[in-house]
């Protein structure tokens, strides 16, 4: 068993070296971020959140500055929506809408039936002007499984729970075919695929990939290891931030590993793409996720 495991790891390593043109450079954008998450390339600049500081930071290509702060938010993700910006506030269980200047326009506290959110975590565009977002539930492997996915209509007026009983729903992305939504089920160590109906609701779910089947485990993994951010890249591949393994797994549409991006931080949280598509990859991660002040860093890989 051990010999076969080493052989598989070597085969995957060779695959990663041969699979694509290597990254030529790595830049540390912010070496002292406080649990960074949710990177978003927008209007020629990078925005990202600091979860443990409830900040949004901005990098203009030269320097980092504070864009927005709200005590108690626990900012976890960002997405553009109707010319504005949505912020997932994990700690306050809300979604905040900001205008282009960072002014708060509204705070969304419940879905259209009056149900509150449990830990808004990440966003994905639905391809028709609306937004999906995950509400993770409790980050505890022994807690009841209450993770959900919600949908915000294109006009921003209707918010509907479209999936539930997910073991800590986390990153999500529209699939390449536009007919499926991929959702990270973090505490189950896998990525789910949901059928998307014409009205944006979600139907049948299947297991799209188990991380243990994509790549061999790393020595320091624990029970909380799993997929965090998930993004469909401009190159048609899926980028999966593996929290707890210091890496981003890159898989094709057939769920075959294309390459591994090794990251200095153990707790890799999310991915975004810059002005040159898959040739500019932003990655956020934390060195420590169990003890304040939760130090982390923001990186840029270029080809």
Predicted segments with their positions:
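A short beta-strand motif characteristic of beta-propeller blades
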Residues: 25-30, 63-69, 105-113, 158-163, ...
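Beta-rich, blade/repeat-based domains predominating
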Residues: 30-45, 51, 70-89, 94, ...
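Flexible "stalk/tail and boundary" regions
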Residues: 43, 59-61, 81-82, 99-101, ...
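Beta-propeller domains
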Residues: 47-66
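Short, solvent-exposed loop/turn segments at conserved positions within beta-propeller repeat blades
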Residues: 51-52, 90-91, 140-147, 186-187, ...
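A short loop-to-beta-strand structural motif that recurs across blades of beta-propeller domains
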Residues: 55-57, 94-96, 147-150, 190-192, ...
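Hydrophobic alpha-helical segments and helix pairs
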Residues: 102-159
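Short loop/turn segments immediately following beta-strands, especially the blade-tip
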Residues: 194-201, 294-300
């Amino acid at each position: 068993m051990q010999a076969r495991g080493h052989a598989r790891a070597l085969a995957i390593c060779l695959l990663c070296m041969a699979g694509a043109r290597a990254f030529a450079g790595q830049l540390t954008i912010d070496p002292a971020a406080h649990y960074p998450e949710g990177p978003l390339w927008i209007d020629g600049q990078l925005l990202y959140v600091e979860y443990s500081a409830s900040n949004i930071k901005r990098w203009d290509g030269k320097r980092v500055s504070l864009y927005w702060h709200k005590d108690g938010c626990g900012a976890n993700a960002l997405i553009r929506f109707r010319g504005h910006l949505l912020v997932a506030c994990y700690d306050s269980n809300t979604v905040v809408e900001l205008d282009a200047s960072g002014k708060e326009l509204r705070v969304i506290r419940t879905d259209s039936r009056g149900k509150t959110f449990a830990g808004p975590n990440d966003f994905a565009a639905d391809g028709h002007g609306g937004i999906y977002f995950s509400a993770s539930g409790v980050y505890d492997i022994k807690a009841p499984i209450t993770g959900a996915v919600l949908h915000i209509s294109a006009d921003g007026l209707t918010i509907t729970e479209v999936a539930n009983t997910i073991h800590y729903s986390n990153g999500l992305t529209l699939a390449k075919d536009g007919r499926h939504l991929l959702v990270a089920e973090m505490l189950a160590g896998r990525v789910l695929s949901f059928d998307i109906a014409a009205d944006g609701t979600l139907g049948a779910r299947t297991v799209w990939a188990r991380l243990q089947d994509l790549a061999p485990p790393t020595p320091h993994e624990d029970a909380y290891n799993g997929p965090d951010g998930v993004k469909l890249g401009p190159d048609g591949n899926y980028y999966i931030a593996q929290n707890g393994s210091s890496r981003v797994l890159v898989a094709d549409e057939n769920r075959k590993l294309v390459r591994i991006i090794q990251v200095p931080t153990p707790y890799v949280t999310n991915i975004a793409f810059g002005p040159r598509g898959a040739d500019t990859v932003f990655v956020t991660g934390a060195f420590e996720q169990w003890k304040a002040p939760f130090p982390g860093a923001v990186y840029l890989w270029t080809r």
